[in-house]
Amino acid sequence: MRSRCNAGAMGATGAIGAVTLSLLLVAPAYAQQPPSGDGSTPLHWAAYQDDLAKVDQLIRAGANVNAANDIGATPLWAASVNGSAPMVKRLLDAGAKPDAALLTGESPLMAAARAGKLAAVDALLAKGANPNAKGARGQTALMWAVAQAHAEVVKRLLLGGADVHARSDTWSQMMAVPPHGLPEYNRVIPQGADTALMFAARAGELTSAKMLVEAGANPSDHDAWGVSATALAAFAGHGEIARFLLEKGADPNNDTPGFTALHCAIMRRDEATVAALLAHGANPNAPVTMWTPTRRSSDDYYFMPALVDATPYWLAARFTQPGIMRLLAKHGADPKVIHESNYVQGEGYQRRKDRTTAVMAALGMGGGTAWVPIDRAGRDALILETVQVAVELGADVNATSIDGRTALDSARAQKYAAVAAFLESRGAVASR
């Protein structure tokens, strides 16, 4: 949805031939000549190039202001892509239809909103442009303005009647996690049904989110999959939006997609949002109930199969967040939780089962990959503090994994001398 001035929409090369437009404009008859092979006219190009003088000449010579090329692009759409208010106004005054859309449904208003040009948006609305027209996948001008952080345009669209409850189209898509070839790690996931508020949560657009909620958007909104705006904001690292939505009454416990906003905030190491979620009633013991997909060879954040059934407290221990562990315990999290995992890893489809406490998780046992990497210089001290908090809150230092290993075994194997010494001081015994 990024703003693009794409000359390809009106032909990849100079569709008017070898003679330049400036020379051809000398002859008024040029305005009436047939369009080029892709349907583009000289008026398209003059509008696209933001040449107001040439546009004036062409219009006076009788050029069709509503001519559309093969993809439905009109001169007004080209001007709107540029966000040129003077050009938009000139074409509208000459009779250009404000809602003439591309074949995909994208209207001039949508293009101007994406460009973030308030004056162009205002001119289109003043001429009756539909603020709720939908383009590809059912997206609206309001959604595009929000996604591009054009808050002033968002405000104008809302004043012009844009629907805060409008949703994008819904479809389903087969998605997977590694190893992608394993049938049980492939499933159909609903996509779309996003409102403008969901776009704000994803993009981190707090100013727009506030305007949308004030205009009636539901703080507990969710998409077709069931991901809430709060969870999406936390997932995307926009804790300030998640906290705002909570203050406005958002449900902190939506777990429809298999995870909650609390899980996302922990994975993002966002202690402020974790605190806000707990203060608003988030369940400190809600487990991750389903893996989430990722693209092949990507750096996407996702809940891998090894994390299914993990609780917030275990996640905080696994990813060395002692402050969050204390917060969770204060709000009722079970610090003696034992995570039982059962998953497949590697292209060899190796089945693995793990049984780990918070102490073991802090040492990397139990699987899973961090979303936010920790600076290597401070990692050892953070692991030690996490282990200390886990033991302080009641974790069994001599619990064993399914293959018989203890936390002390892991500490020694990884040469965490300070951690091993601490565990020994608390009665830990090696199994091997």
Model-derived segments and their meaning:
Residues 36, 69, 102, 135, ...:
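Ankyrin repeat boundary/linker residues
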Residues 13-26:
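Bacterial N-terminal signal peptides
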Residues 51-59, 84-92, 117-125, 150-158, ...:
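Ankyrin repeat structural motif
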Residues 45-50, 78-84, 111-117, 144-150, ...:
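Ankyrin repeat A-helix N-terminal signature
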Residues 403-432:
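Leucine-rich solenoid repeat scaffolds
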Residues 32-71:
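N-terminal segments that cap or nucleate solenoid repeat domains
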